[in-house]
Amino acid sequence: MTGLVDAHGNAVSTASRGALESSERALWRMMSFYGAPTDDLDAAVAADPAWSLPHAMKAGFLLGLTEPSLRGDALAALAVAERLTGGANERERAHLVALRLLAAGDWAGAGAAWNALLVDNPRDALALQWGHLFDFYRGDAAMLRQRVARVLPEWSDDFPLHPYVLGLYAFGLEESNLHGEAEAVGRHALAGTARVPWAIHAVAHVMEMQGRHEDGRRWMAHRRADWGALDGELRNGFAGHLGWHEALFALESLDHAGALTAYDAFLPADAHEITLQRVDAASLLWRLDLLGVEVGPRWQALVAGWPLGDEAAGQSAFNDVHALIALIGAGESRRARAWVAAATAAGAAGAGWNRAVMGRLGAPLMHGLVAFGQGRFDAAADALVALRDGAALLGGSHAQRDVIEQTLLSACARGSRHALGRALYNERSMARPATPLRDWWARRLSA
């Protein structure tokens, strides 16, 4: 033991204050999305080359991006961290246990390992951040809330990352349909000076699910400075996704021009650095297509910048489904069929969570989307309605998975499953107040 502890009282196995400070700055970047943490982690390694945690943090950060091209770098960092475990303390070794499971594709097992770590280390924000991220990727709404709830009473405003932990909790509450509590916690997270994009995001989700599209547009405009530049850096790394939410509020108002403006500002093809940004772009363009909005060359630009070789498939069914949407939207029917085959094969050959998801949900969902793209709307409707009750398995949020629901409504309207479409619309109308978009679907399904 070195006697050093981090800002939240967790013992660390480095004797270098510089290494500790750099690692804590990297953790803040992970939770705030202000700048990539890799430079800070490199600084921590330079200050103490024998400390395993910065290498583990780099591995976890890269794995969390679900980016196929970064997997090799992630595994290399994890290998270095494992070689240095002799000097690591019990908490740091527990992170390595979770990361090994994560690297092997066992997302649920990794989440359980982080939960076990948090029992004895309730203020380990790294375990909270990573556990929360993969709860989100697994669509586990209950654990998004419960993981943070189990430790939140051990936190207070005295701890610098407390607002960011509140942001995690707010999102977990929202995904658990506890909308009033979620909004209150999200607003509380933003009551001080901390800029917490995840809390802004949680409140935006509340407003989306409640059909408060005008409130949502005002909210995003009011909090814009909190996901802008900080200390001369580029805009917040979460800006693309928050811009996606801004576009959804515009769509709910049937402001198609506003949605396209948000797309061009926050999700243009030349600004995409990772697959998660391309996923948001594909989801938004698809929703516009469902409404009959002309999007110009945006589909083609999106696909042109998206690495979609066979080696890119199989890491995340959620990402693979959105890549298929992009190919269909761009009119690349041959490539779309090839992508389904590659993603299905990669899923079957893989291990862990993604293999199960691709087999149970991803592959049949992709076949339904291909049918939709081919104009076989009844086949698409039959495929999608059979999957909807288990759609959370795909991962992501309620708002993100609504693209499947809207595709199903469109298939019913365009094909002969009109009675099914009306029943699904009735279900939707009971859950959300009237908005221009909801009324548009009512007219479409009554035609």
Where are these regions (language model features)?
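Asp-box/WD-like beta-propeller blade repeats and closely related beta-sheet repeat scaffolds
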Residues: G111, N115, N121-D124, Q129-F134
